[in-house]
Amino acid sequence: MAAPSGVPPLRVLEELGIGLSPTGEVTEAVTSEGAYYLEQVTITETSEDECEYEEIPDDNFSIPEGEEDLEKAIHIIGEQARDIHILEQQTILPARNVMQEAIEDFLCNFLIKMGMTRTLDCFQAEWYELIQKKGSDFKGLGNVPDVYSQVMLLETENKNLKKELKHFKQAAEKAKEDLLRTQKERDFHRMHHKRIVQEKNKLIADLKGLKLHYASYEPTIRVLHEKHHALLKEKMLTSLERDRAVGKISGLQATLKNIDMGHIQVPVIKGSYESASITRESGDRAGHSCEKENSSEGPTQKSLREAREEVGYKSKLKNEKKDSEFPVDMQPDPNVTSCTENVSAAKFDYKLNNIFRLHELPVSCIVMHPCRDYLISCSEDRLWKMVGLPQGNVLLTGSGHTDWLSGCCFHPSGSKLATSSGDSTIKLWDLNKGECTLTLEGHNHAVWSCTWHSCGDFVASASLDMTSKIWDVNSERCRYTLYGHTDSVNSIEFFPFSNILLTASADKTLSVWDARTGKCEQSLYGHMHSVNDATFTPRGHIIASCDARGVTKLWDFRKLIPIVSIDVGPSSGNEVNFDQSGRVLAQASANGIIHLLDLKSGQIHKLVGHESEVHSVVFSHLGENLYSGGSDGTIRLWI
């Protein structure tokens, strides 16, 4: 490498770590990068034929003009090669050791900086005197540390400490959360353990009580077993006596039949029993001789005559009253349905307008007259009342049931009324006369609901005895008893203008029946609680039902599958009714609220005005008014 211009060669050698001895010889200088040597080379002259020449590009070096000789060219090439070799190697710079400033130098520099020359002179004089006197005692005083380095070290240490502090805080928070969670789990398991122990102790106590209870039943069971055997013996004896009595009755009936036909002559008693003679006639009734007018009628003859008269009377009544026939093809009566032709649009913004206080006890059912603006209300006070609308004037009051009334239904013509009661009867009333015309008996428990067939010849009833009955109004007898429900039948309704019946039961099911055969055609499952009421839309394509948990379900009557379920509970839904358009469904709830469901949009509107339970709800003919009956004995008008 060529030395820069203006720099002495010795200086360049010193920078490279190479020096010369006083005699001019080259000396070796060892640096951190290694040893460098300077050798003297003598180039001998050789023939040009023996040398191999290498072309050197002109761009790599430059020789000033006038100094172009072989020695300089070789020197420059060698320097260039060394430079390339040095650049290819990884240069390791020596570590820089910064010497800290001595204390006395720091003080001197501080005094000079502040311009305190006199103080500096005094300090230096006194300091050097001390050094001369004590010598090496001041060598261990140390140096002044570098403030900036110390600050950086402290800052770095501070940052590290802050990071560690943050890490420890996070770990502490996590440990705290784990501790709280563990404590909660411990408390939960402790409480659960205590509860299990209490339940265990309770079950042990109950088990001991049951063992004692069942032990006390053993003597009773033994006594009942003995009674059972005794009753079986009595039953066998009773069966024998019954068979004997049936034989006697059969003989008496045969005797009566023969007497009626004139084949047997009634004996005339003369004196003792042995003198009585029975003469069999072979002719007709004209040859029958009997001295009845000359002898007194005995008790046996009197009983036979009364039995014959009773049987004849019943057979005569039976022949006079014939059973009605179920219609085969029915169409809506235009005279009955004419009042519902002009139905207004659906309405939801009803407001409480009037309160009719009609009964002293809760209202159980309200129904609208098929055509007129009349309303019938039934109550637990054993009365039903006909009310004129919209004034609420009582037009007619009916009494005759011996227990609370549960429901009522108008005859399709509107001239008759059927009522069901807790006295297990159904009564038919003539509204023109205001009196009961027929009482239907046959249920074993309270009757919850009744409904008229569209032809007006049949009435169906639902009872607590888990059965429903179809009554023939003309023959005044039960045509069919519908068995199938496993709990109380709460509601019953005829499908409009058909022979199909719909029942709702406390066994959480709905059933569809054929009234002509009395058989169940289909059962609908879906409710989780007792079904209180079920009804059809005016068109008859949808069934609505509500249960004791406030759940209302809509069913497709054609497919007999559920469409939608609306939960407005947990209060019980007591009754559901459609308006004449079939778009609005009203539900009477036990919490005093009337829920109106829009079947088109699915929205639910609430009517609040009752102070207690709502038992029944019904729309007016055109849907402009709504009537509701509550447990406070009132009927409320909503317009």
Curated annotation (Swiss-Prot):
It is found in: Cytoplasm; Cytoplasm, Cytoskeleton, Cilium axoneme; Cytoplasm, Cytoskeleton, Flagellum axoneme; Cell projection, Cilium, Flagellum. SUPFAM superfamilies: WD40 repeat-like (SSF50978). Pfam families: WD40. The keyword Coiled coil applies. It comes from the Eukaryota. Residues 281-295, 303-325 have a biased composition (Basic and acidic residues). Phosphorylated by TSSK2. Residues 146-218 form a coiled coil. WD repeats lie at residues 358-397, 400-439, 442-481, 484-523, 526-565, 568-608, 609-639. Residues 280-333 are annotated as: Disordered. Expressed in testis. Interacts with SPAG6 and STK36. Necessary for sperm flagellar function. Plays a role in motile ciliogenesis. May help to recruit STK36 to the cilium or apical surface of the cell to initiate subsequent steps of construction of the central pair apparatus of motile cilia. This is Sperm-associated antigen 16 protein. It comes from Mus musculus. The lineage of its organism: Eukaryota, Metazoa, Chordata, Craniata, Vertebrata.
